[in-house]
Amino acid sequence: STQGVSSAASDVYKRQSLYTTDFTVCVSDFDESTVQADTPAQLVEQLARGKCLAVSAQHPGAVVIGCDTVVDVNGEVFGKPHSTEDAKRMLRALSGAAHEVHTGVCISDGTRTESFVDSCRVTFFPLSGEEIDFYASTAEPYDKAGAYAIQGRAALWLDRIEGDYYTIMGLPVSRTVQLLAHFM
């Protein structure tokens, strides 16, 4: 169950209270392969919505947040790499280039469901073959969209960010808290 925040409180109080609200992490059984979309941003919003509603159905009365992130390289979606070669392929494509990171967030209380997508443009410095090989030999790229963790070693490759850093990490915190306040 979810601990609520008094609706009589000011928005500032609500937002501060959300940092201390108890929550439980639930893994969704949503089948991501069923989702089709015209754009990477639409895809990630539908994935977040599917995950959110799958968990919401199992936890009636709870406020559920679902989220997903994809890396968009000229319209090609980079999810989590499936192999070392896949990780290297993604990193070569990101090297010295700009790409978009889209994070979809969906919140539902079982009655009402709202969602949004936040996007951020990221530019990497050129990466050497040795850097790519070394990074692909670590565990870091394999559970991350686009084969990199911006808060990890990939921070060294960062030339420019246009947008919310937390969108790249997978949860645009301030926008999520603003939307979550509507459910409290």
Regions found by a protein language model. Give the residues of each.
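Cofactor-binding loop segments of dinucleotide-utilizing enzymes, especially the Rossmann-like FAD-
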Residues: 7-8, 28, 110
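Glycine-centered loop/turn motif at secondary-structure junctions
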Residues: 19-20, 184
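Anionic-ligand binding patches
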Residues: 38-184
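Short polar/charged helix/loop
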Residues: 18-19, 72
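Short glycine-rich, Thr/Ser-proximal phosphate-binding strand/loop in the N-terminal lobe
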Residues: 20-37, 113-119
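Single conserved hydrophobic/aromatic residue that forms the stacking wall/gate
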Residues: 1-9, 13
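Short loop/helix-cap segments at secondary-structure boundaries that form the rim of catalytic
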Residues: 15-18, 35-36, 57-58
